[in-house]
Amino acid sequence: SLRESGKRAGLSLMTVVQSYQLLESQGWIVARPQSGYYVAARPQPLPQPSRGEKLLLSEQVDINAFIFDVLQACKDPDIVPFGSAFPDATLFAQPKLARALSSVARKFTPHSSLANLPPGNDALRRHIAQRYALSGMQVAPDEIVITAGAMESLSLSLQAVTQPGDYVAIESPAFYGALQALERLRLKAVAIATHPQDGIDLDALQQAVEQYPIKACWLMTHFQNPQGATLPEANKQRLVTLLRDRQISLIEDDVYGELYFSAERPLPAKALDSGGQILHCSSFSKCLAPGFRVGWVAAGRYAQQVQRLQLMSTVSTSVPTQMALADYLLHGGYDTHLRRLRRLLAQRQSAMRQAIAHHFPPTVKVSQPDGGYFLWLELDPALSSMELYRRALSRGISIAPGRMFTTGDHFNHCFRLNASFEWNDRFEEAIKTLAKLIRGLAAAG
């Protein structure tokens, strides 16, 4: 029993429970109702995906139509949503958020709208600044601008540091939202190879900044979408130094930063910012309130420019949702929610990885992120993830093919899976079906 384990080890019951939960989340043990914990069967792990081409230049970005089609499929409740970009909605504290929204609605006055114009709700910005401070970072509330989700943060940041026609360094593969933003703002992408484990190739980035007049670098430092990569601390330092020496702004997309599986949150590159040239963007959409669409940017020396750009576009972020989030963060047990969320995501990622290892051909490579909720898979280069996408969709399963995350025809043998959903027979069968389809593609040659 847990109590006996604690006595033998000289540990408290709470410490033993937390240790067992960690082992379960990592797939080492399984819990059986009214029976206890057992050592889990560990299938042979699959190899990790490889790094793509080091440096790719795209003068034009145009992928919107295809992304729209893929995302539309994920809205169908009869489709297994492995291709979705959104976390399982059942993971979030909806009743508490609803009560907070109801409470602030009763207090809402016409003055509230004026008081919450950019840079946004004062209480919410103070709370975000406090969370930065707790992680060892000094970010003033005046530097923080509340936005309509992370995408607005990122778009405003791009507009603040670039002009149409400028070159922007991005990851390859990249979050398709970045590609869409570059297309909309008529910017040129310089795609830098990114490894599923340790992130952007800094040698390739250095080559790029020497070869092109790059004005900004946009990347995810933690649990990158789609690969799940996290930039090691030494690489963050090298990245910040490289960009600072060339006066290149860094737009740090950190929407998955709170979804870590380790003991401590990895520090953003923003923690190393000495000149205010790093714009740190994040959101509550992936960790608390997907439907609220509230994000922020700690914009450094660009804070006033970002505020002006927001006033000229969306004017402000939804005021009731800002107020509700500020109320929830003060009273709602946010950190307790985050601990539960991380534990569940770690368990679900482990369950999906084990199912893949059991059912997929051994030639398939799969990432092993330390957080977030995406897995990146690599097929034999001769196989097409687009064809797999079409065949899977005809059988009620969505995936996100690699083409979504590139400006060209790269990563056509790769795809992304969403691992945030509670594992059950439906998802296990979907993995089995994908395995059969992959074998069918290989047999067809």
Where are these regions (language model features)?
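Conserved glycine-rich beta-strand-loop-beta hairpin in the small C-terminal domain of fold type I
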Residues: R343-R353, K365-E378
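Conserved core segment of the aminotransferase class I/II
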Residues: L97, S274-R343
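N-terminal small-domain helix-loop-helix segment of the aminotransferase-like
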Residues: L57-G149, L156, L330, S398, ...
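N-terminal basic, amphipathic alpha-helical segments
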Residues: S1-S102, Q307, L311-S318, R339, ...
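Short Gly/Ser/Thr- and Asp/Glu-enriched loop/turn motifs at secondary-structure junctions
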Residues: Q34, A140-P141, Q368-G372
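Hydrophobic residues in well-ordered beta-strands that form the structural core
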Residues: I170, A191, L250-E252, L325, ...
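Conserved core of the PLP fold type I
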Residues: R106-R246, G257-G275, L345, A442
